[in-house]
Every structure is written in C-alpha cells, then in structure tokens.
Amino acid sequence: MAASMFAGAVRAASGILRPLNILASSAYRNCTKNACLNSILSSRHFSHIQTPVVSSAPRLITSVRNLTCGQTATVLNRMALLLPNVLKPPVRTVTYCSSRKGKRKTVKAVIYRFLRLHSGLWLRRKAGYKKKLWKKTVARKRRLREFVFCNKTQSKLLDKMTTSFWKRRNWYADDPYQMYHDRTNLKV
C-alpha cells in the first residue's frame, strides 16, 4: 500500500525526477537483478551499454516492468551529466569591474588579507590562526601565526584580483619586508 502511494507520488513529480522514477521502480520490481544493478552503480562509465529508449509516456508504466539493467544504465548516464555541475566546489575567481568604463577593480579582501612583494610573491597567514585559540597549544598557535608564501596558482589569481596600483614598489620608512622584496637567489 505504502509502496504504491510512493510510486504514484514519484510519477506525479516533474520531468526532472522521471529518471529517478525509472531507476527506483526498476530496482523495486527487479529484485532478482540487484547484483547486476550494484555492479553497474559501482562502475564509473556507463557509455558502453546500449539500450532502447522509452518513447511515450502512456507506455512508461508497462515498460518499467520490463526494464533490464542496461536501461537503468541509460538513466544513470543521464543523471551523471548533471552531477559534475552540482558537486563542483565553490571557487573564488571574482574580478570586479567598474560600471562606467569596464575596467577591473581591486577586491578589497585581497588587500586586507595578503601582502604582495615586489617580486610577485604573495604572503599570507596560515588558515585558522584566529580560530578556536582556547584549545590550541602554544606551539601550534605560534606556527599558525607564521607567514607563508602562496603558490603559483594562488599568486596568479590574486594578481588578477588587484590592479596595477597595488603592484607598484613602495618605499616605507621601517618596512620589515624590505630585504625580501627582491629575489637575490635566482641564477641567470
């Protein structure tokens, strides 16, 4: 009773849920083919399996009973195309542009959190140096306060997020980083 109500609710859903309806119904009705379904689910690519396509909606209920493991693979192929867009990790590649001339603008968070040396290297604090200090040891807090260099990918991204104003050489009176601005260990 509950299973038929669930199947009816899933069938009434939009077209996005239709592949899931086929997959759930076939898994429920074809209990003897669970081993085949598990082997298909565990594999990475489903493109080598060719199956007939269900064409009309009225025949959907009758065709669900006759589903084979190959047809569930077709459903998984359709769903696999949607997954990379959903599961992408968030990436900060924002560069602000002015509304008047369309020039790039500086992202202020970069200026506050990072220090750019004139050689193009970027300095930053280690992540978490201000967080949950009550449960960190003194040695760990000292290690977190240290400055580290950003890698090449991060440096290129930070250069895109800042304008040329922030890349010029500055001559501060008591600059503690004065000796680090120029690279002296490069062999020409």
Curated annotation (Swiss-Prot):
| One Pfam family it belongs to | Ribosomal_L35p
Biological-process GO terms, alphabetical: translation
Main subcellular location of this protein, as a coarse class: mitochondrion
Protein name, UniProt field: Large ribosomal subunit protein bL35m
Keywords per UniProt? Mitochondrion, Ribonucleoprotein, Ribosomal protein, Transit peptide
GO MF, one example: structural constituent of ribosome
Give the location in the cell.
Answer: Mitochondrion
Record flagged with keyword Transit peptide:
yes
User: Gene3D superfamilies attached here?
Assistant: 4.10.410.60
A GO cellular component entry from the record: mitochondrion
Query: What's this protein's family per the entry?
Result: Belongs to the bacterial ribosomal protein bL35 family.
InterPro entries tied to this protein: Ribosomal_bL35-like (IPR021137), Ribosomal_bL35_sf (IPR037229), Ribosomal_bL35m (IPR019338)
Query: SUPFAM superfamilies, from UniProt?
Result: L35p-like
